[in-house]
């Protein structure tokens, strides 16, 4: 923020109607501040021109005021405020009075600073994202397959009996985990039962027959 115009002006007091010299600063944001002197240590008053000022009078337009001794009426300047207060001023010269008039008038009617401040605030509100709590984070869905609840058909096995006849009977499988193991068909062949005593008798009989045959052969020779 910078100064738009600064300088000395005579200001008439509100009660005693005396003229007093003050230092005036007009800032770029539209604030007109006047001090006791140029050091700016003691502020007399301030006026926000875009908000407080409703009219600016110069020269013969000024009311209820007489210029200080030695000053023409064209050096007079009045700032009419919204609250009914009127600040009566007198410039060093007519040209200085016109320069102050035009500068103050531009500051009063120029709402670029106020408008930009309001616009930036609205833009910031519009551009700001909503609270994160407004949008809940979606819960991720997990898809899986449960264990197989069905049962595989029972396998079969073929069993041959001693007489050579085949039989198909279901085969029972042990537990094979969650998914189980597919059954398979198996063939089991059982050899026919042989009697050990019968085999021994047949062997002895065969041996005796062989011995008799050999004995007869030797007897002939």
UniProtKB/Swiss-Prot annotation:
<protein>
    <recommendedName>
        <fullName>Pleckstrin homology domain-containing family B member 2</fullName>
    </recommendedName>
</protein>
<dbReference type="GO" id="GO:0005547">
    <property type="term" value="F:phosphatidylinositol-3,4,5-trisphosphate binding"/>
</dbReference>
<feature type="domain" description="PH">
    <location>
        <begin position="2"/>
        <end position="109"/>
    </location>
</feature>
<dbReference type="InterPro" id="IPR011993">
    <property type="entry name" value="PH-like_dom_sf"/>
</dbReference>
<feature type="binding site">
    <location>
        <position position="20"/>
    </location>
    <ligand>
        <name>a 1,2-diacyl-sn-glycero-3-phospho-L-serine</name>
    </ligand>
</feature>
<keyword id="KW-0472">Membrane</keyword>
<comment type="function">
    <text>Involved in retrograde transport of recycling endosomes.</text>
</comment>
<dbReference type="InterPro" id="IPR039680">
    <property type="entry name" value="PLEKHB1/2"/>
</dbReference>
<dbReference type="GO" id="GO:0055038">
    <property type="term" value="C:recycling endosome membrane"/>
</dbReference>
<keyword id="KW-0967">Endosome</keyword>
<dbReference type="Pfam" id="PF00169">
    <property type="entry name" value="PH"/>
</dbReference>
<dbReference type="InterPro" id="IPR001849">
    <property type="entry name" value="PH_domain"/>
</dbReference>
């Amino acid at each position: 923020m910078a100064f738009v115009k600064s300088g000395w002006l005579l200001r008439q007091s509100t009660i005693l109607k005396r003229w007093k010299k003050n230092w005036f600063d007009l800032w770029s944001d539209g604030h007109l501040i006047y001090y006791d002197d140029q050091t700016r240590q003691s502020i007399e008053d301030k006026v926000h021109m875009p908000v407080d000022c409703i009219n600016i009078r110069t020269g013969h337009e000024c009311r209820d005021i007489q210029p200080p001794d030695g000053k023409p009426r064209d050096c007079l300047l009045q700032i009419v405020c919204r609250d009914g207060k009127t600040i009566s001023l007198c410039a060093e010269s007519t040209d200085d009075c016109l320069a102050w008039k035009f500068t103050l008038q531009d500051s009063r009617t120029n709402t670029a600073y106020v408008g930009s401040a309001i616009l930036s605030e609205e833009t910031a509100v519009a551009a700001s994202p909503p609270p994160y709590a407004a949008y809940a984070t979606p819960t991720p869905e997990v898809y899986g397959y449960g264990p197989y609840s069905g049962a595989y058909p029972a396998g079969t096995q073929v069993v041959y009996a001693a007489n050579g006849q085949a039989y198909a009977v279901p085969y029972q499988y042990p537990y094979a985990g969650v998914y189980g193991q597919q059954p398979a068909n198996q063939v089991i062949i059982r050899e026919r039962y042989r009697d050990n005593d019968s085999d021994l008798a047949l062997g002895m009989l065969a041996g005796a027959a062989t011995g008799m045959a050999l004995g007869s052969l030797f007897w002939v020779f």
